[in-house]
Structures are given as structure tokens and as C-alpha cells.
Amino acid sequence: MLYNPGVLLAQLFGGQLKSSSSTYPTGTVHCKPQSRTAVVEVTNPITGEIWMDRNLGAEQVAISNTDALAFGDLYQWGRRADGHQCRISGTTSTLSNIDQPLHDDFILVPTSNNRDDWRSPQNNALWQGVAGINNPCPSGFRIPTSAEFTTERQSWSSNNSTGAFNSVLKLPLAGYRERTDGVVSLIAEGSPYGMLWTSTINNEEAIFFAYWSGNAFVNPYPRSRGYSVRCIKN
């Protein structure tokens, strides 16, 4: 299902979908300006939650869980959509001491870094709610919490990547970007993975939501890794 720029279409996909008039934050860098992510709402009929029907940066709703056009971008936790999230963005090893780095590079963090965060010192408020300092979601949307992803998972037909794709969210196996070298990989532990950030922090790390052929779960991980983002309506 393809969308022309500026045209929002809705299609029934197991749940209720409708177009939205939401706009992206000022300064948002779209990795593919000619096909910026359409804002279309999808409602989970079991939980009642309203989500975007695709990942940030995705060109279309996934038609399979390996649909590359549905993968979207890979964000470091807490960063705005400044271009670092583009899968082919440059890299830098210089940590940032401000909330909005003055560049579009993916910030590499060695494993020897005590906090393993792109920002030093850390700021826990960057992605908290619609008013989060660096919330990359369109107006009225935000990064979901760990609890919200857990509730979503519990509504699936199976607790794995099959359940993720068969759900109304049509979640693809979009991979991740490694924090130490900036390499993008679709494979983790020998299997394709889908990994999405939540807004929930856990001490010096943040909670991400992962799913693969064998399981789906939430877990803490260093904030400097690049994961997908799926926005939820506030």
C-alpha cells in the first residue's frame, strides 16, 4: 500500500484505520522527503489504543514482516528526527552535552563507556509524553511506554514475530543499528528481529520492545543503539 506525499489514505487492516491531520515537529528531517511517512491511525479493537499504522520513516504499511519499504528509520533513544535516524547517516565518536546535537550523525559509543549513552550527562526527559523535548512523533502522538507495548503484545494471536505482523500494527522485522560501529543489521542471535524503543527508562538504560520468531518481550538496553519507533496517540 503506497501513499503519495501529502495524501492520506485509510484502509481496513484488521482494525479501524483513518487518516490524520497531524503534522511533524518543526525541524524534522525526513530521510526520504519525496515519500515522507504518512500519518494514518489504526485502532486495536481489543485494547482501544490508537497507533500510527507504520514505523517512523516507513514508506508503506508492511505487506510482509520482511518488507523493506516498511522498515523505517533507526533512532537513538531520546534524539529528535535530526537525520541521525537515517540508515545511511554518517557517524561520529564525539558524545553530545546538549539535548539537540548540532549535526545529523549517529553518535557511536564504545562499550567501555560507563553509561553507554549518546548524551553526557544523561537526560531522562527527552522522550516523555507529547511534550517530550525531542519527541519525534507527529502532533498528538508520542513514544509508547513499556507497559503499553506489553498490553499490545498480550492482544496478539501469538507471542512472536508472527503475532507482531498479524496484529493491526503489522510490525516488520526492521533490525537495529549497532552503537559501537554504526552498522545496520537485520539479524540478532541468528534470527531477524524487530526492535522498538519505548519511552520508559531503567536506571541508565531505556526499555525496548523486541520480537522475533521465538518470542516477544521488553528489556532494558543502552540508549545509544538505533531502534525503530512506532508512535501511539496520546
Language-model segments: residues:
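Extracellular/luminal ectodomains of metazoan preproproteins built from arrays
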Residues: 26-28
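N-terminal low-complexity, intrinsically disordered "leader/linker" segments enriched in small/polar
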Residues: 2-16
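Core domains of carbohydrate- and sulfate-ester-processing enzymes
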Residues: 61, 82-97
